[in-house]
UniProtKB/Swiss-Prot annotation:
The gene is Prm. GO terms for molecular function: Rho-dependent protein serine/threonine kinase activity. It comes from Drosophila melanogaster. One of its GO terms (cellular component) is myosin complex. This is Paramyosin, long form. Keywords: Coiled coil, Cytoplasm, Disulfide bond, Motor protein, Muscle protein, Myosin, Phosphoprotein, Thick filament. InterPro entries: Myosin_tail, XRCC4-like_C. Residues 1-31, 859-879 are annotated as: Nonhelical region. Expressed in all larval and adult muscle tissues. Expression is five times higher in tubular than in fibrillar muscles. The more-acidic and less-abundant isoform is phosphorylated. The modification Phosphoserine is found at S18.
Length: 879
């Protein structure tokens, strides 16, 4: 509880009469601090509070005594009931001994508390005596200070009286000075009236000059307006000239551009003409070729009508192709003709534009000449206006000089008038200041007299209070002696009470130490568990990190290998595709050659059937067919070798596919292991969260306990305040016969304060433990968040690896599709080759049959371009 302090102020006024003209009143304020009385009142209230608390404690002890007596009776009954069991009797005896020991300790605690209360009362009594002595010393010091202040105030009063006399003398001197200044003011007023008359004359003359000046300024403004119009017309003419020049330059540029475009168009026309000529020549060549082809066609038609019937479709296709090509060429020629016509139109249009531009140029040149003439005339007019303006400016400057001189005279007169007015104002201000000073000095003298009177009154009051304090001091000494006697009486009771209180304190200390040991053991166990959990988490996290890093490195290695194999496979596929395209082209050539040979062979058969004279040509065709066959065989061998290469490549692809599938299975197993480890880590994380929740619940329980203690403390404070209010009402009745109870209550309060301090220490320790636990919880949460982040990163890496694996699977499937396509193509080529071989075999068999029927001898010369002589012998077999 906070002690309230009261301040009492006493005022004394002294009135003194001096030999001077005025009286002085002096006021002295003296403040006395009554903190000692307030302290005593607070102590009395505290003692009353302790009395009530001690009464409550006594009632509680009596209740406990009654409860214990009831328990003793119950225990005796139980002992009578359980006489048969020796062990039960021993336990009951032990419990009874323990309860008796507790009661003895309580009695010892009461004795100790009483001794402590007596010591406290002695200390309080000594403190009260010292406080009274200090108050007496303070009062004596205050009295000495008051006497010193009185002497100072008297000296100040004498000084003020001397100042008043000096002020009166200065007042007489200032009144004389004021009369002199009034005479000078009247003279200055006469001068001011004369100056006003001269100012009126000067102002009339100034108005005349201003009117003349206004007229001259109007003339100057008119001339300026004319000049502005002339300059504006000049600027317009110059701008028109510049526009004309710009137009001329633009026209020149356009003309040059048009000439360059014309030149380009002519070049393009020449190139188009050359193209037309080339196209016409190509058309003529094509027509010649067509004529030749038509002639060949007619000759072939005349020769082999039967062949035309057989190959009518091929001829129609060739005709269609030629017709399509002819139509394309005709369309191209028509487009070229259209381009030529467009270019000729452009040329004519550009020529017309050039003519129009030439006409515009001539017009602009004529307008330029006219504008130059008008500019020359304007410049002449401008020179005349400038000469007039110079004359008017000279007149204006002379008039301004005269006006400035007159204005300077007027300013001087006005300045003198202002000085006179300022002097007058200063004199009036000084007069007012002197009057105000006189009034203030009179007021200060009256205030000093009043303060002297107040100081005398305060001195009288202080003397009366001194007498009262001496009487109170005597009464306090008598009360002190009585209280000392009472304190000696209470000392014995207090010693007994203190002895009992010490015993109780020892028991409570033992209980507190046991509780502290238990709490410290629990805290150490919790810390050990937290440390073990942290170490386990850290080891598991490091192990998982290491495993995942190893797996990531393995995955990266496998990815690099897969990328390399993919690149190699892509290169092989590209090579194979190029080889396949080459094979296809070569095979198409072979097919064409085979078709040509077959066509030739069919023609030979028809000729042999129809014409025996064409056997030599058939033989030549046979030779060519043999050659083609050899080439085909060679190509077949090459194709077979390429097919073997493709099969080996396909086998390698299949092996690579199997390897990739194995790697995929390994990656899948790794993925399953990682997912299992992730599940294990999630379970551990959940366990850690459960432990954290348990720790948080414990923290909340501790906080609730602290809140309960604070509420109990607040309720106790409220009860103490209420009791203090009640005790203030019953102060006088409770102080008389309650010293012994007060001593016991003070001892009890000390015990409660000690318990409070111990509770505060426990509270501080629990808060420290809570903070440590909160730190550990935060660290665990941070580690959990880091683990979650690592898990997220690992999941991202796994997703990326799965995506890459899917990409590899797609690439593998695409490669498989490509390999299947290549195998189908190879099989198709093999089938076509087998069909060609069958055809060649049939042709050979038919040729052998023909040879058997007809024998031909071919004689050829080695000279190129020589004729072939065929000697044919027919043999008919008749049976």
């Amino acid at each position: 509880m906070s002690s309230s302090q009261a301040v009492r102020s006493s005022k004394y006024s002294y009135r003194a009469t001096s030999t001077g003209p005025g009286t002085a009143d002096v006021n002295i304020e003296y403040i006395q601090d009554l903190s000692s009385l307030s302290r005593l009142e607070d102590k009395i209230r505290l003692l009353q509070d302790d009395l009530e608390v001690e009464r409550e404690l006594r009632q509680r002890i009596e209740r406990e005594k009654a409860d214990l007596s009831v328990q003793v009776i119950q225990m005796s009954e139980r002992l009578e009931e359980a006489e048969g069991g020796a062990e039960h009797q021993f336990e009951a005896n032990r419990k009874r001994d323990a309860e008796l020991l507790k009661l003895r300790k309580l009695l010892e605690d009461v004795h100790l508390e009483s001794e402590e209360t007596t010591l406290l009362l002695k200390k309080k009594h000594n403190e009260i005596i010292t406080d009274f002595q200090e108050q007496v010393e303070i009062l004596t010091k205050n009295k000495a200070r008051a006497e010193k202040d009185k002497a100072k105030f008297q000296t100040e009063v004498y000084e003020l009286l001397s100042q008043i006399e000096s002020y009166n003398k200065e007042k007489i001197v200032s009144e004389k000075h004021i009369s002199k200044l009034e005479v000078s003011i009247s003279e200055l007023n006469v001068k001011i009236e004369e100056l006003n008359r001269t100012v009126i004359d000067i102002s009339s003359h100034r108005s005349r000059l201003s009117q003349e000046n206004i007229e001259l300024t109007k003339d100057v403004q008119d001339l300026k307006v004319q000049l502005d119009t002339v300059s504006f017309s000049k600027s317009q003419v110059i701008s028109q000239l510049e526009d004309a020049r710009r137009r001329l330059e633009d026209e020149d540029r356009r003309r040059s551009l048009l000439e360059s475009s014309l030149h380009q168009v002519e070049i393009e026309l020449d190139s188009v003409r050359n193209q037309l000529e080339e196209e016409s020549e190509a058309r003529i060549d094509l027509e010649r070729q067509l004529v030749k082809a038509n002639a060949d066609a007619t000759s072939w038609q005349n020769k082999w009508n039967s062949e035309v019937a057989a190959r009518a479709e091929e001829v129609e296709e060739i005709r269609r192709k030629y017709q399509v090509r002819i139509t394309e060429l005709e369309e191209h020629i028509e487009s070229l003709i259209v381009k030529v016509n467009n270019l000729e139109k452009m040329k004519t249009r550009l020529a017309s534009e050039v003519e129009v531009l030439i006409i515009d140029l001539e017009k602009s040149n004529n307008s330029c000449r006219e504008l130059t003439k008008s500019v020359n005339t304007l410049e002449k007019h401008n020179v005349e206006l400038k000469s007039r303006l110079d004359e008017t400016i000279i007149l204006y400057e002379t008039s301004q000089r005269d006006l400035k001189n007159k204005h300077a005279d007027l300013v001087r007169t006005v300045h003198e008038l202002d000085k006179v007015k300022d002097n007058n104002n200063q004199l009036t201000r000084e007069n007012k200041k002197l009057g105000d000073d006189l009034h203030e000095a009179k007021g200060a003298i009256n205030e000093l007299n009043r303060r002297l009177h107040e100081l005398e009154l305060e001195l009288r009051r202080l003397e009366n209070e001194r007498d009262e304090l001496t009487a109170a001091y005597k009464e306090a000494e008598a009360g002190r002696k009585a209280e000392e006697q009472r304190g000696q009486r209470l000392a014995a009771d207090f010693n007994q009470y203190r002895h009992d209180a010490e015993r109780r304190l020892a028991e409570k200390d033992e209980e507190i130490e046991a509780i502290r040991k238990q709490t410290s053991i629990e805290i150490e166990q919790l810390n050990a568990r937290v440390i073990e959990a942290e170490t386990r988490l850290k080891t598991e996290v490091t192990r998982i990190k290491k495993k995942l890093q190893i797996q990531i490195t393995e995955l990266e290695m496998s990815l690099d290998v897969a990328n390399k194999t993919n690149i190699d496979l892509q290169k092989v596929i590209k090579k194979q595709s190029l080889q396949l395209t080459e094979l296809q082209a070569h095979y198409e050539d072979v097919q064409r050659q085979l078709q040509a040979t077959l066509d030739q062979y069919a023609v030979a058969q028809r000729r042999l059937a129809g014409l025996n004279g064409e056997l030599e040509e058939v033989r030549s065709h046979l030779d060519s067919a043999n050659r083609a066959k050899r080439t085909v065989e060679l190509q077949y061998e090459e194709a077979a070798s390429r097919i073997n290469e493709l099969t080996t490549a396909n086998v390698s692809l299949v092996s690579i596919k199997s390897k990739l599938e194995q790697e995929l299975s390994v990656v899948a197993s790794d993925y399953e292991e990682v997912s299992k480890e992730l599940r294990i880590s999630d379970e551990r994380y959940q366990k850690v969260q459960v432990e954290l929740k348990h720790v948080v619940e414990q923290v909340h329980e501790e906080q609730e306990r602290i809140v309960k203690l604070e509420t109990i403390k607040k309720s106790l404070e409220v009860e103490v305040k209420n009791l203090s209010i009640r005790l203030e009402e019953v102060e006088l009745n409770a102080v008389a016969g309650s010293k012994r109870i007060i001593s016991k209550l003070e001892a009890r309060i000390r015990d409660l304060e000690l318990e409070l301090e111990e509770e505060k220490r426990r509270h501080a320790e629990t808060i420290k433990i809570l903070r440590k636990k909160e730190r550990t919880v935060k660290e665990v949460l941070v580690q959990c968040e880091e683990d979650q982040k690592n898990l997220i990163l690992l999941q991202d890496a796994l997703d990326k690896s799965t995506a890459k694996i899917n990409i590899y699977r797609r690439q593998l499937s695409e490669q498989e599709g490509v390999s299947q396509q290549t195998t189908t193509r190879v099989r198709r080529f093999q089938r076509e080759l087998e069909a060609a071989e069958d055809r060649a075999d049939t042709a050979e068999s038919s040729l052998n049959i023909i040879r058997a029927k007809h024998r031909t001898f071919v004689t050829t010369s080695t000279v190129p371009g020589s004729q072939v002589y065929i000697q044919e012998t027919t043999r008919t077999i008749t049976e």
